[in-house]
Amino acid sequence: MSDVRLRFAPSPTGYLHVGGARTALFNWLLSRKEKGTFILRIEDTDVARSTQESVDAILQGMAWLGLGWDEGPFYQSERFPVYKEFVEKLVAEGKAYRCYCTSEALEAKRELAMKEGRKPKYDGTCRNGVEEPGDKPYVIRFKAPHEGVTVFDDLIKGRIAFNNDELDDLIIQRSDGTPTYNFVVVIDDATMGITTVIRGDDHINNTPRQILLYEALGYPVPRFAHVPMILGADKTRLSKRHGATSVMAYRDMGFLPEAMVNYLVRLGWSHGDQEIFSREELIEKFSIEAVGKSAGVFNPDKLLWLNHHYIKESASERLAELLIPFMKERGIVPESGPSLSLVVKTLQERSRTLVEMADGAIFYYRGDFAYDEQAAAKHLVPDAAPLLEALADKLEALADFSQASIEALFKEFIAEKGIKLGQVGPAVRVSLCGGTASPGIYEVIEALGKEETLRRLRRAVAFIG
């Protein structure tokens, strides 16, 4: 194992968003490629908004995508003593100070700066020490350098520089004694030995402040890679109005995890013109430097196309297992009907999602369906009844009820009767499926099995009268 250490650090204030999932995936892929360590950290310092339900949703989403972690999950809420120790260290070394300025005074200074056309930032009233009564509330600020430039080479964006005189003296501990995000993230990354930080580009402006904290604490500064955000089709930030944004919502909509992984990694990263990647190929070929600088646009049609590909390529036995909850949602107990694996085989080519597959499978398990009125009027006609009855008799005598034998029987049957398949096929399809849209009739007959096929054909004959 190498010294490369990466982390995914979500806040448990909601579900695992597709943007967060992509960030987790990039970190996971790089850790696997470099034979490093992938750490999961839950940033739950916002106790009021953090929920166990959200933690569970994040862990569930990670597990569904197959993004296992090597260390963790670590919870920031359990590390407050660690943060307090580092705050006290900075204060003792003169690198942080107590600030007694009230929120009203700070707001007045902010408004004045805006009025005078200056960038609003803390003016350093308490920076060099002030005598205040011990019972007055205070925050603790980091004493940031006001001269020079903070520069870092972003692995995606390139060189980025900030003038230090534009940076505030960052609050690192609130008046209630709790640490702030920008402080705890540095302490965690430093003490956990994180070597590369891959995160959303909405964190770029936090980076110079965090670099200055690393330097003040005497820790090595990790490499940074800021990933562009994901946009909706209208080029605004992806949100619920664009459709589902939760990873687990896509699972519930019948998407396969490998399709989601393949789609997410291609939202910003590419390897030539290749579209389909196995997990092994992704680990081998992924590089953070190949992630584009511009935002990716979420395209549900592309995700559907990928999902259809993976459904067609997947083993029917695995899909059958995944399909069971979708069937039960529709009130169907698959054990009470034909082999679900055989049913799946008939639907793989035509199903883009497991939801579509489950809907397409219903007729196999409900033999009492009503016939589509138009289809019945057109195909379940008096001339069809003797053909269906004769076909049922032939099928009843068939010993080998495989698709190949069924197809051979049909060819023999239409030759005997001197008819074309089109003169009996649609009537058979409506008899077995209730309508004219279904998988191939030979596949359907094999999946239904002899007993159910005969029952449905004779039911149709009785319907015709």
Curated annotation (Swiss-Prot):
SUPFAM superfamilies: An anticodon-binding domain of class I aminoacyl-tRNA synthetases (SSF48163), Nucleotidylyl transferase (SSF52374). A motif ('KMSKS' region) lies at residues 237-241. ATP binds at K240. Disulfide bonds: none annotated. It catalyses: tRNA(Glu) + L-glutamate + ATP = L-glutamyl-tRNA(Glu) + AMP + diphosphate. Its main location: cytoplasm. A motif ('HIGH' region) lies at residues 10-20. Belongs to the class-I aminoacyl-tRNA synthetase family. Glutamate--tRNA ligase type 1 subfamily. Monomer. This is Glutamate--tRNA ligase. It comes from Geobacter metallireducens (strain ATCC 53774 / DSM 7210 / GS-15).
